[in-house]
């Protein structure tokens, strides 16, 4: 059973022993812009998971589970795992000061959407919650903790929080130390490794579904505790696996709410580049990522307009069919798309 919490849909897909899809379900959601922040309600995440899983069929047959979700952003919790501030997603561009300072400090490009940039920006802003932080993680890491009790993260997702050393497959020790020195005069009751999830590579033991976790996912009661759950990953990692592009000198392009290319490198870059984000594959190999915040948002708005028009005419709407026909018809268009461009 694979579950992904994307920026526009929460998906659940079950495959058989021959890797063929047998059941699928989804739930549509969207980020809210509240008080200058792009955010999602975590309660809606659980509603979406339950809704998507209703269509999966007999969950009693599930033998393994994987969670993935949108990467980066800022989810900060206290010692009892109470959310300290609303989820700040990867869509926010509110950490320019922190991003610039950390890039200079590390000698490594730190994009605004990365978790470490959000954390340090909160420090620079003297936000009240900072001293109460006990855990920070990604959306996949949060869901995984809730269903297994394990505070872990797949190395690919972890590399979008703070830089990862591709040799050790965990957080870059030198950069962790530099950050700790940077905040040492603040008197916080934590250091960086105290609050980060443990980084795991693909295939490592990331825990098992708990009875409480099974209830959170499946209202039918068919999903049983004890199912192994793989290290939670980011949506970029699942994209690399799905396109069979995890080996060095391979790559893929993702076209979703955001667009990005992922190129698996055979050696380090010679220097940092502002437009290239260094992350990893789910097994820890270096990846050069070029990311644009907007891709299908304009298209989705047009498709929803078509959907409303069909509904006004009383015509049943299957969104998968609408997108399928639109994409296939687009192949007949001019190579330059009629001279139109959607600005990022």
Q: Which residues does each PLM region occupy?
A:
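N-terminal glycine/serine-rich phosphate-binding loop of ATP-dependent small-molecule kinases
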Residues: 1-86, 100, 104, 132, ...
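Short, basic and Ser/Thr-rich N-terminal targeting/leader segments
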Residues: 6-9, 61-63, 68-70, 115, ...
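Short, acidic/turn-prone active-site loops that include or flank metal/cofactor-
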Residues: 27, 88-95, 158, 257-259
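ATP-dependent phospho-/nucleotidyl transfer catalytic cores
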Residues: 190
């Amino acid at each position: 059973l694979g579950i992904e919490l994307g920026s526009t849909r929460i998906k659940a897909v079950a495959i058989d022993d021959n890797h063929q899809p047998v059941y699928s379900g989804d739930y549509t959601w969207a980020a809210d812009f509240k008080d200058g922040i792009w955010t999602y309600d975590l309660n809606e995440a659980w509603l979406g998971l339950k809704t998507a899983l209703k269509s999966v069929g007999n969950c009693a047959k599930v033998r393994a589970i994987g969670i993935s979700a949108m990467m980066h952003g800022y989810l900060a919790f206290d010692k009892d795992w109470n959310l300290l501030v609303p989820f700040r997603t990867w869509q926010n561009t509110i950490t320019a000061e922190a991003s610039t300072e950390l890039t200079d400090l590390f000698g490594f490009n730190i994009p605004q959407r990365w978790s470490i940039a959000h954390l340090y920006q909160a420090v620079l802003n003297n936000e009240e919650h900072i001293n109460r932080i006990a855990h920070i993680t990604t959306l996949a890491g949060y869901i995984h903790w809730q269903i297994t009790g394990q505070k872990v993260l797949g190395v690919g997702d972890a590399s979008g929080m703070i830089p990862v050393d591709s040799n050790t497959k965990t957080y870059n020790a030198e950069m962790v130390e530099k950050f700790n020195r940077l905040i040492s005069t603040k008197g916080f009751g934590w250091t960086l490794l105290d609050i980060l999830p443990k980084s795991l590579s693909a295939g490592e033991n990331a825990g098992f579904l708990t009875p409480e976790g099974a209830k959170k996912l499946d209202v039918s009661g068919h999903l049983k505790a004890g199912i192994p759950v793989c290290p939670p990953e980011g949506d970029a990692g699942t994209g690399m696996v799905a396109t069979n592009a995890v080996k060095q000198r391979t790559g893929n392009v993702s076209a979703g709410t955001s667009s990005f290319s992922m190129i698996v490198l055979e050696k380090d870059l010679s220097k940092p580049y502002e437009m290239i984000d260094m992350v990893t594959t789910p097994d820890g190999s270096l990846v050069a990522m070029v990311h644009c915040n907007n891709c299908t948002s304009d298209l989705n708005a047009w498709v929803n307009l078509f959907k409303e028009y069909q509904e006004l005419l009383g015509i049943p709407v299957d969104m998968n069919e609408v997108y399928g026909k639109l994409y296939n018809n687009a192949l007949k268009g001019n190579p330059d798309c009629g001279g139109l461009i959607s600005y990022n």
